[in-house]
Amino acid sequence: MAATSEGPLFAASIEKTWGSVVRSPEGTPQKVRELIDEGIVPEEGGTEPKDTAATFQSVDGSPQAEQSPLESTSKEAFFHRVETFSSLKWAGKPPELSPLICAKYGWVTVECDMLKCSSCQAFLCASLQPTFDFGRYKERCAELKKSLCSAHEKFCFWPDSPSPDRFGMLPLGEPAVLISEFLDRFQSLCHLDLQLPSLRPEDLKTMCLTEDAVSALLHLLEDELDFHADDRKTTSKLGSDVQVQATACVLSLCGWACSSLEPTQLSLITCYQCMRKVGLWGFQQIESSMTDLEASFGLTSSPIPGVEGRPEHFPLVPESPRRMMTRSQDATVSPGSEQSEKSPGPIVSRTRSWESSSPVDRPELEAASPTTRSRPVTRSMGTGDSAGVEVPSSPLRRTKRARLCSSSSSDTSPRSFFDPTSQHRDWCPWVNITLVKETKENGETEVDACTPAEPGWKAVLTILLAHKRSNQPAETDSMSLSEKSRKVFRIFRQWESSSSS
C-alpha cells in the first residue's frame, strides 16, 4: 500500500514543479532523466547537464571521459596507444594482431600480452600458447581478433567508432602530404649534422637507390624549400654539407625523423609509425667515418724518433675537437699514470717506482717526469722479476701507449652501419607490404600498379619520383645537383673501402 501511495505523490510533485510541460506523457521520461542528471552532475564538479555517453564514461572512471568522442579521431592519441606496445610486452604476434590494429580499437598494453581499453578499462589477455597445430593457432588468432571488438564493456564506444584506417597507413593517395612530411623529416634530420649514421653502399644497392634517384629526391627537396620563403634561412644553414643532405634524404625517405630538435638532447631518431626510437651513438656516424676515410687516404704520420733512437708511430688520424682535447690531456699525463690506467689490476700507491728501473734510465725518467715518484703505479700481473719490463720509461711501454691511443682514436670502427629499413619493426607500414595492399583493397588510395608487392618506403619513392617527373622544369640546376649526388656516392664507396680494410 505504501508503494501504491508513493506513485501519485511523486507524479503530483513533478506536475507541481514543471506545470503543463510534464503533463504530456511523452515528455515525462525525458524530464525524469534530466532531474536525475542534475543530481549526479555536481559530483563531477559541473553544473550543466551532460549527455548519456558522457555520464557512462564518468561512471566508468575514465580520466578522458569528456574527450571520448574525440579520442577515436585523434591521430596523436592513436600513436600514444601504439607507443605502449613495446617489444617486451607485445612480441610474436601475427599481422592481424599488430599494434596498429589493437590501437585502432582503443587498446593499450599494461603487461606482457595483456591489453586494456583506454576508455572502459576492460582487460583482454592476448597470449598465444605454443602449439604445433597450425589450425589451432589460426583459430586462436581469429578469436583474439574478434575479441578486439567484443571484449569491451557494454556501453564502450570503441566497437562502434574505432579510429580510422588511414592512421595506420601511409598517405599514398595524397602526394602533397607525402612531400610535406618528407620535407619535415629531412629538415629535422639535418639538425643532427655529422651525428647522422653512416650508410653502407651495399644496403643502398639492395634498396635499389641509384645515384639518379637520390639526385632527383635532392632536387625535389630543393624545389620544395624554394616555395617556403620563411624557411630560407634555415635551409641555407642546413644545405652546407652534401654528405649530411644525402644521408638525411635517404633516412627521411624510409620514415625516420629526429626525435628532438633541442641541442641538449641525445641524438635519437624516431619512426612515427611504429614509434621506434634508435640511438645513433651505437652506429658508425658520419664524423667518425670521415676521419677514418681521411686517414685511409694517406694522412698517416711519419715515424717519430723515440727513446734510444727507436721510431715510434703515433697515428695522425684527423680527430674531432673532443678527441683532440682528450689527446692533449693524455700528452700531459706522466708515464706512471698511463701505466695505472691501462692495467686492470688493483692500484697500489708506491713512492719508489723509480727503483724498478736501471741506473741508466733513472736520470732520463726523472727528467721526463719529475713527479713520477709520487704517482700511483700498478702492480705487475706476474712476479717481481718482470718489474723491469713494466718500467714506465721503457720504449716498450711507450709503444703500447701509442697503440692504446690508436685504438681509442678509432673506437667507432667496430660499430655497425645503420640500415634504414631493418631498424623498423616488422609490422611498420614503411617496411610492411600488407598494409599497402589494404590501402588498395579499401579504396582509400588510388595507387595503380606501383605497390602490389613493395614495402611502404618504396611506394613513397615511386610516388615522389613520379611527382618530380611530372613537375620537371627546364634543365637548370639538375646537372649540378647530379654532380653532388655522384660525389656523395663516391664518398659512400670510399667509406666502405676504408671500413673493410
UniProtKB/Swiss-Prot annotation:
Family annotation (Pfam families): NuBaID_C, zf-C3HC
Ligase in keyword set: no
UniProt-annotated stretches for the region Disordered: 21-73, 302-421
Assembly behavior: Interacts with TPR; this interaction mediates ZC3HC1 nuclear envelopes (NE)-association but also required for proper positioning of a substantial amount of TPR at the nuclear basket (NB).
N-acetylalanine sites (modified residues): A2
Subcellular location: Nucleus; Nucleus envelope
Residues where Phosphoserine is found: 24, 58, 62, 68, 320, 328, 334, 337, 343, 353, 358, 369, 380, 394, 406, 482
Annotated protein name in UniProt: Zinc finger C3HC-type protein 1
Gene name, Swiss-Prot/TrEMBL: Zc3hc1
Zn-finger (C3HC-type) residues: 102-156
Organism name: Mus musculus (Mouse)
Biased composition (Polar residues): 54-72, 326-338, 350-359, 369-383
Known role: Required for proper positioning of a substantial amount of TPR at the nuclear basket (NB) through interaction with TPR.
GO biological process: cell division; protein ubiquitination
Motif mapping: Nuclear localization signal: 395-401
